[in-house]
């Protein structure tokens, strides 16, 4: 029987990373749950890893044997609107029932609330697996991660009230964007007023492009401070569907991810609770929410990268032209090898980022219970910085790779790829949104570029160059060193130009170079530890990086302020 976890040993490989031992010890707080007699809590590192394998195996089984077989029906039917309520596609309802029965909700939450206490690494693996089966359903399922923000910033009373419901399988949404506030969230105008009589907040206004907008529990960004127009007037609220006051006005008809309802909502005096402190909704809470969501989109992207590669590979093996299978043609195996290299490198970046997030978040959680040692504080600061730096490249690069792999899968299918009966067209339609929502790739560049210019990425790269690799990888590593020198020169050229427009115009090329060098080093490390899985991809990806970094460095270092005139739109 198919299983989307056990069928792909490349996923399981990332459970064996050297950082996992420290990560699990912090996540389990030295296994205190087991010491306190909590059921199913691991007693040591090996027990924890075995728990993760079981959870991933269950996820892989449900993905392969329930969600994927339902995906075509969901894509064709989609959700619909009845009496201002969103109704899921019938097979989406079945997916929800089966994932609930399997216990796949509230998985990141502490066991005292009914959760499984899995780290981000494992949650990201689950997200990847479900996305490979159906990226639209992954949206609905993975929005449970909004509960992490409530856990982090909500009161103990709110935790006790809402977290067990998510662990039981209720759904969530994050209601941020509005008709006039898309990427520019400081323009949010949904109004929050305090009801003295009822001792609660009331929300009024419209939200647009809300994924899973008719969910059970919403986190809502709203303007709580009268007379303000910027981000400092915004707060975060919890809206419970049981209280009423929110209608679904419209469900968007989209290019892809048809099973995932994208809603326009009207808030009409809806009762809500303040989450955290006033005025910190955008500048603190939404930033945490968005970083988690961006990691989720990176995982969603890797799932589609994998499925697109699977579809292309299977078709190339069976399709014969000119007397032989098309997989024998250089033009085809060139595409397939690049697809696999992007997949393996992108997955490595995803899980390295998730590990950094886990290490930082676990130390932060421990700091709520006790004072951290000076060494732990330094460790938390280090991993916080790395998580912040790696998240935008993990999201941006993987979302682009998903579209590229889906595009190439269609190319391998030829005319059949353009026919609706083949899955590759759906993967292509689904993938297109990944580089748009939760911040376009251009916004990921904006988030990352300061780490390019302040030398953070360069130091990470130089540190990675010091790590030992296998004899087979040493020639590749030697080829990366001159690329790093070229990259450093390109960065310095842009900094020395001292022109903001030139800096912004060239930022994307510097971002791409950064990510490609980092992923080259990551995939070499993977190939050192598991050559049977990654050696081919390492060779292909380093060659791709050489080609791209050299071309982009040349472009950057031959660009001047005068060149901008040719590109400016009138």
Stretch-by-stretch model annotation:
Residues 344-395, 491-505, 528:
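C-terminal helix-coil-helix/basic helical segment that borders enzyme active sites and/or dimer interfaces
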Residues 2, 9-10, 19, 257, ...:
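Alpha-helix capping/hinge segments and adjacent helical runs
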Residues 60-61, 91-164, 168, 211-213, ...:
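Internal helix-loop-helix
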Residues 318-342, 352:
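Terminal amphipathic helices with adjacent charged low-complexity linkers/tails
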Residues 1-82, 86:
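Extended, charge-enriched "interface" segments that sit outside catalytic cores
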Residues 36-37, 242-245, 249, 261-293, ...:
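A glycine-rich, basic-preceded beta-loop-alpha segment at the flavin cofactor/substrate interface
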Residues 455, 467-570:
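C-terminal amphipathic alpha-helical interaction region
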Residues 200, 204-246:
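A short core secondary-structure module
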